[in-house]
């Protein structure tokens, strides 16, 4: 199904507007052209059912609203009724617009005539001097311009303040992220400092141990020297044939040199280990700083992406809300139309029930009258046979079997020699020839036979 509504444009429109609305649900589209004041809306309803088309024209010469429907077994009866209702509503709307335009034109003609009659330069010479109002008008114009300028400045200041606040917010977020990264770096360096402090404590303990050992060796050396000096201070002369003794001074000097070399080697090893650890820590710190910078940049990009996605989400939510509102409005309109149609259906059903009731009543009356007619015809035939087949007497009774009217009288003779029985059938009919009541009167007269 394809549906298209097009509208024309008014030439005298000061600000034309253009809008379009497309609904994709079975190929339905609505399009509106430039319009203002709705001086003329042109469209045409044409429905193609196996190749036929139709169109309308209303609204003071403007084409009437319409639809183009291509139905190939896909259009149900409800949709036909809906499109017909839409067509009728659009036609009535165009009629009201045309009436309003005519009323506006009439008012414009009246205003123009009044100005021609009573305005400045009219034929009566009623010229008015409005020069005293010009300064007031200029003053008011200046005030309006000043107010507009001040409002524009205020709006500009508000926008600038909003932009400044946004900039400060971004700066605050960046500084907060930088502060957090620096705090993380400081915490990492504190752990490194604790490790270095532990290493320094171990080295101090080793230094104290070596110092105590050196002090102990010095003390032993001093005691040995004192013992040797005391032994050398006596006058005992002992001559011995023995190997030459060991020079203790040289031995102590050698031992001192070895310990000093050992201490220097330990110091160099500790310094090299410390430098190696410090270099590795510096390299790790530099790598962590680079990783932190890249992570900070990535975090900034992610924040920007998050803001963009939030904006898109807000726009999609607004679109969803507007679509829900339009859907609710459409449902309410169709529910109102459905309620109106149901009310009309109920009224028609009530009328149909009333018509059926009246028809049944008329049927019963007709059956009763038909029974009366048949009964009277049988009586007439019986009376004719009793009379003796006298057609003239039967015909002169003033009764016809197929004629019922107000005041019809049938006279039949039961026994011509003894008595005459007269039966009167009285019927009351209304203006529409409807039989209201039927009454049968029997009169018996006795007479002598000739």
UniProtKB/Swiss-Prot annotation:
The keyword Coiled coil applies. Residues 1-11 have a biased composition (Low complexity). Residues 137-228 are annotated as: Coil 1B. Residues 1-78 are annotated as: Head. Residues 229-251 are annotated as: Linker 12. Residues 79-114 are annotated as: Coil 1A. Residues 391-450 are annotated as: Tail. It is found in: Cytoplasm. One of its GO terms (molecular function) is structural molecule activity. One of its GO terms (cellular component) is extracellular exosome. Residues 252-390 are annotated as: Coil 2. It holds the Pfam family Filament. The keyword Cytoplasm applies. Essential for the proper assembly of type I and type II keratin protein complexes and formation of keratin intermediate filaments in the inner root sheath (irs). Plays a role in the cytoskeleton organization. Heterodimer of a type I and a type II keratin. Heterodimer with type II keratin KRT5 leading to the formation of keratin intermediate filament (KIF) network. Interacts with KRT6A to form filaments. It is linked to Woolly hair autosomal recessive 3: A hair shaft disorder characterized by fine and tightly curled hair. Compared to normal curly hair that is observed in some populations, woolly hair grows slowly and stops growing after a few inches. Under light microscopy, woolly hair shows some structural anomalies, including trichorrhexis nodosa and tapered ends. Some individuals may present with hypotrichosis. This is Keratin, type I cytoskeletal 25. It comes from Homo sapiens. The lineage of its organism: Eukaryota, Metazoa, Chordata, Craniata, Vertebrata. The gene is KRT25.
